[in-house]
Amino acid sequence: MRKMSFASKSLVLLLSIFAARGADKNAPFKPGPTESYPCRQTQEKVTVAVQPFDTEEKTRLAFDKLDPNRYGVLPVLVIIRNDGPSTLMLDGLRVEYLTESRQKVEAIPSREVAKVNAPGRPHISGGPLPTQIPRSSTKKNPLTNWTIEGRAFAAKALPSGESASGFFYFEARHRSGAALYLTGLREAPSRRELFYFEIPLDAALDGR
């Protein structure tokens, strides 16, 4: 019998969460623990796990019928677990998507995601975006869906022993060889900045 890869097991876990939510459409999206994701890294007792939501099957878990990828927006789930002794300050957290060619794509503030679908806005992508991206007025723009801002990463501080999670959004198409780059995590008492996190995302592709 062929064994399932860790990434495949993670996708099954995500799908089981979605199935459990099926009976209650208003139930909040709840990601799994950091150790359930294959793309993760631990430094100084802080673990960061990430999961690109690059398929319709995955986006349905958090955004229901909306697939932001259809409109040129890649959602990436970020979970941060603080097992250190001090509270972490996240107000200066910076998250960038590194393409396979090492091009840095900055995260789009959640309140500005809808502008990606506005006519005339230049694209900054990690590879060709899907052709014939739907264009619509702001009023009917599907990216104005409440889930975009409602699911966004919003934590500004993270006490010891706790986790925080949410989505960051990038104008990019997910491809093999990409990574997520995080900087700006600081210890609250000293304001000392932790070492950066660079997390390869290829393990997530194995779970498709």
Annotate the PLM regions.
Residues 1-11:
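Bacterial N-terminal signal peptides that target proteins for export
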Residues 13-22:
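Hydrophobic h-region of N-terminal signal peptides that target proteins for export
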Residues 22-208:
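Conserved functional micro-motifs across diverse proteins
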